[in-house]
Amino acid sequence: HVFNVGILFVFLGGAGALTYLAKQEDVAGQNSASYLKAVLGDARDAHRITALAKAKGIESTALSLLKDDPKTQGARLFAQHCASCHRYDGHDGLAVELVKADTLDELEKRSGMTSRFFSGDAVHPDWLARKSDTQGEWQTVKSVLDAKTKGPFDVIASAKPVDAPEAPDLMGFATRQWIRDLLDPDKYISPRYFGGTAHKDGDMYKKFLNRKVRKYDAADLKMLDAIAVALSAEAELPGQAAADQADAALIRDGVQYLTDDIGCIDCHAFGEPDPDADGPDLTGYGSRQWIIDFVKNPEHEKFYPNNNDRMPAFGVKKILTDKEIGLITDWLRGDYFEPAH
């Protein structure tokens, strides 16, 4: 009997040791950052399926709910086809947002081995963090800890991109703030916008932003603010509908500044076709159809017929289907179901 019990403990001990080693590989091995992120991604998808099922019911399988869901599929398609050049808030679109870390000590504790073994809010050292309430560049958690930066920190489960972006960051595309920052000379040529493209040396920067906007006084800059509001209203973004309705008068003023005072129509069509326009057509800028048309063929006469910079014609070349382009578009615009809170 004693021998049998001893053998049992040996087997149990061996099983426990193997379990420990397997768990250690999962949380600290060479591929641990990817593994832990995949676990979080699966959990996120499960929560999304639950939300969609409660609202719409299940026609066939739970996973079928995700096939037509822009929030999940749009992000995946973006990561697969767009993130080699573009970013989405500095990552590939598939980052999992984690609980903020209020202090450096908290971030260090959450990234430790013990936390990764047992805690649900653990952070891998290879994931990314940055100061909260900023649009600063993401750094690896390890780099933040080594630099002893003061918190609080936003933290995401995502790997740091190997290469610098070669096209604009599309988080918030066509929102008021995104457009207003686009009209800032320094931001226009930054990596967040066109710093990695040939457009940084184009007429938009050289003849307008650098030559004119840098000399604008307060009144001129106020007109640019109104133009950003008016141009963003062209997108008809779902998350901005109430603000656009409330700011109808400001939008009308912005349209006037765009067409008259600032003279955007010297280079862009707006409201009606202009065969002599050098820049993209601003009519419906950022709207669902505008984005779809652009992704299908950026070299169309409405966009960049002569100076497209490496953007593939995803529709013309059949790289993406119409449905896939629509999913990416709706995801970028935030046009998808969200449960009421």
Regions found by a protein language model. Give the residues of each.
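The canonical Cys-X-X-Cys-His
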Residues: 74, 78-89, 107, 124, ...
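Sequence context of c-type cytochrome heme-c attachment sites
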Residues: 34-72, 79, 87, 112, ...
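C-terminal capping alpha-helices of c-type cytochrome domains
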Residues: 122-155, 209-245, 250, 314-341
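Sec-exported extracytoplasmic/periplasmic mature domains
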Residues: 83, 112-115, 119, 146-150, ...
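Gly/Gly-Pro-rich "capping" loops immediately C-terminal to redox-active cysteine motifs
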Residues: 87-116, 126-129, 156-184, 190-212, ...
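Electrostatic cytochrome c docking/interface patches
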Residues: 46-78, 92-96, 133-137, 150-168, ...
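N-terminal export/targeting leaders of redox proteins
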Residues: 1-65, 143-152, 157, 215-231, ...
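C-terminal substrate/ligand-recognition segments
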Residues: 2-29, 70-71, 75-86, 176, ...
